[in-house]
């Protein structure tokens, strides 16, 4: 410590190699310079919490009748900011201790004193890392702090530093208790002397602190921290307004979840389900990676969209999570990977799934709306959250051949109404319900009254095969060739061709179509269509194959099996044409056209020119014969 030339002013050297540490804070610790305001407001809130608590037992506190508040004054022309509170203030010793040493904070000492006295503070304090104040040096070269402690015999002091390794303290006249921080902004940060910008930052980070924040004569933080109140004390109207503020969604939420958790971790949360999936999620599901609820520590925003609070498949849930247990890195911008964070995530995930389960049971119509909007995202959890996999499967819903459009069935309901002798859960995947219901592969199941799940969500292609079975019932695509259709009989309306006629016909199909197919076999699944394509036992079904080709364009298509319905009139007519003249060129034209028609049903017909030419040939032949 050295004496300054000014009478009454003393100069001090920073402890803990402050010059290097301040450089670290300014250039490395905070990625957004606006954070300085959040930190200064948080410190002011701490000081107000302290004086409010001390006033309960200490009658000597000066200005005890003054309303507790934080006031910010701007000068856009001089580019200066003044932040003032009427909190507990500091003595000269506290100035040296709290502003002269990094990683030391009056808040931390205050909490320690309360703990030793076994008292509880009715309020929340932050700033336990002792660096928040110094973030102001990101935006200014010099800071002045004028303060007076709340004690009756206290004096006023002025602390000034340019972050160059020293600070000065001098005694001043100050009538009111509390602290006033003033500074001029660096040229590159003059925007922070504009009222709109400061209001923006307050609403973003400090909207829910316990005390009013005035910018000039206007109070900025007017919205209550609803999550801190009891669920029964919050009206639906308040929740809806809070959701609109939080999400910028003009529609009310579909539902909300109010949590207060105490145990190995303590946190409060207010979560919302949007009525519809946001457009950015509808078209870019990858945007889930950057979403998440807002994370607060004691009502101060730490992360706008905290990805660590929820698994990716639940990040469509909006809301706020607030904890006092979360350890932070030296900067509040970065949340540590910690057991506390992992525990919060685990508990939140379980609570949210319970929320969905209760909704499905007690409010099925609301759940149907939810599932229509967010079912695709929920399904992602099947392949990422193995802890809750069975619960996610229980929440899954599907349209089926026995539901109306827009209505759903669960796996449990499907199994309960399976036909006698049915041992498998059948599904059919494609682009839309109309296409699925028109597919030839569905004919047998429709004819027999066997329910088939209709999967038109692109996500289903990836997640359903991974389920393998439900209630010991294997899941099976109706495109597979290895389905046993013989156990219930064909019940064909027309008798099939005898083997002596069908085998030569199938051989001609193989010869005409060539090695682009694996085989041609007689069908037991077709009822009203002449042919269809199916996948081999170990092959991908057509929907999965198309998805894989979109991701890997060079991936070769697997050969399919062509099934031929030898009961169909077209096939019987072909057999008759062969018997009459097996060299008739029209026979091969019809065979090729039938195969291309099957490809068209699959959405895999690439060479449409040949298909149209053959169609014209067949029309010409049909019109000539009349």
Curated annotation (Swiss-Prot):
It is found in: Cytoplasm. One of its GO terms (molecular function) is ATP hydrolysis activity. Residues 333-546 are annotated as: B. Keywords: ATP-binding, Chaperone, Cytoplasm, Nucleotide-binding, Stress response. Residues 547-626 are annotated as: C. It holds the Pfam family HATPase_c_3. The keyword ATP-binding applies. Transmembrane segments: none annotated. GO terms for cellular component: cytoplasm. The keyword Oxidoreductase does not apply. Residues 1-332 are annotated as: A. InterPro entries: HATPase_C_sf (IPR036890), HSP90_C (IPR037196), Hsp90_fam (IPR001404), Hsp90_N (IPR020575), Ribosomal_Su5_D2-typ_SF (IPR020568). Molecular chaperone. Has ATPase activity. HAMAP family: HSP90. Homodimer. Belongs to the heat shock protein 90 family. This is Chaperone protein HtpG. The gene is htpG.
